[in-house]
Amino acid sequence: MTVGLFGGSFNPPHGGHALVAEIAIRRLKLDQLWWMVTPGNPLKDSRELAPLSERLRLSEEVAEDPRIKVTALEAAFHVRYTADTLALIRNANPDVYFVWVMGADNLASFHRWQRWREIAQNFPIAIIDRPGSTLSYLSSRMAQTFSDSRLDERYAPVLARRMPPAWTFIHGPRSSLSSTALRKVQLKKAPSKK
């Protein structure tokens, strides 16, 4: 079985996240995609973070494909970092082929993640195109560090079964929706507290 692991704050989840998930399922030929809602992102301000239960509920609403399984694995495992979560998932599922799925907009800061090289050395990575990222992704530290491990996107269907490090950039339809922009709109609509 091949499973995509798609993690994030999803604060809030939106159609752009669903599009990334659908592209990953289709282009990587995944049996399932685990939509992993994190309780918190160490690189983001947690004061703007909606409760985990709300983000899980909204993610379920956005993720319509039955192959998408919305989870709170980091909370269940009581871990904070993606590298720890992925190690626990792999140990619990030794017969599953996993691929880490991320939007290209996250690639610019991927080198700031705890043990990011370990993630790339232990999991194939599929980077899904996002607006504004198509031309800049090659200059990211991850793309430069692992340039010899890049596969042409025509090999995306076999990426999950490749020995890491292995990664590809998948072009395709893009959504301009952004959680940050959606939160700003919600703040403007909210009644002011005086």
UniProtKB/Swiss-Prot annotation:
InterPro entries assigned to the protein according to its UniProt record, in alphabetical order: Cyt_trans-like, NadD/NMNAT, Rossmann-like_a/b/a_fold
Pathway annotation: Cofactor biosynthesis; NAD(+) biosynthesis; deamido-NAD(+) from nicotinate D-ribonucleotide: step 1/1
EC supergroup of this enzyme: transferase
Entry EC no(s): 2.7.7.18
Catalytic activity: nicotinate beta-D-ribonucleotide + ATP + H(+) = deamido-NAD(+) + diphosphate
Domain of life: Bacteria
Sample GO molecular function, one term: nicotinate-nucleotide adenylyltransferase activity
A Pfam family: CTP_transf_like
GO BP, one annotated term: NAD biosynthetic process
UniProt keyword annotations, A-Z: ATP-binding, NAD, Nucleotide-binding, Nucleotidyltransferase, Pyridine nucleotide biosynthesis, Transferase
PANTHER family the UniProt entry points to: NICOTINATE-NUCLEOTIDE ADENYLYLTRANSFERASE-RELATED, PHOSPHOPANTETHEINE ADENYLYLTRANSFERASE
Role description: Catalyzes the reversible adenylation of nicotinate mononucleotide (NaMN) to nicotinic acid adenine dinucleotide (NaAD).
Family classification: Belongs to the NadD family.
Protein's name according to its UniProt entry: Probable nicotinate-nucleotide adenylyltransferase
